Amino acid sequence: MEKNQWLAWAVELQALAQAGLYYGKDVYDMERFQRIRDMAAEMLSQIGELPLEKVKPLFCGEDGYQTPKLDSRAAIFREDKILLVQEKDGLWTLPGGWVDAGLTVAENTVKEAREEAGLAVRPERVIALQDKDSDNPPAQAHKICKVFLLCSELGGSFQPNS
């Protein structure tokens, strides 16, 4: 069996258990949902060959109904070229990142373009939504939804991110 399938099952079990813990009312069901959540963390620990005490706080640290993490990206064009920035891992991507609490997707995209490329931008419209797990294996421990916004360049001068 492929590791990615086991990871997908562990993530789904964790999300289902977390929903059960959030909505459950019966003490016995709560115990069962907690055990399922613990088992999902144990599965992830085995899959990733990581100590359980490191996995559990990251994988089981959220309360409430599990929802995807939101990532925003700025698509900035100059003539027929698109701006890419280099990540720490050496790969290239559109400027962007996790949407910070308290910011809208548009506000976050403006912030990320400034931080990662030194550019002031104005988001014009959403041009794509992406389920990262569906389009970019391997699967992550959390579902990720990427929002791509077409942006107009307002000013600034390109600064490579560090």
Predicted regions and their residues:
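Short amphipathic alpha-helical heptad-repeat segments
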Residues: E2-Q14
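Long alpha-helical scaffolds
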Residues: A10, A17, F33, R37-A40, ...
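Secondary-structure edge/capping motif, primarily at the C-terminal ends of alpha-helices
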Residues: A17-G24
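Acidic, metal-coordinating catalytic segment for phosphate/diphosphate chemistry
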Residues: V27-R73
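N-terminal strand-loop-strand
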Residues: K56-T93, V121, R125
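Unchanged
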Residues: V99-P123, D131-S162
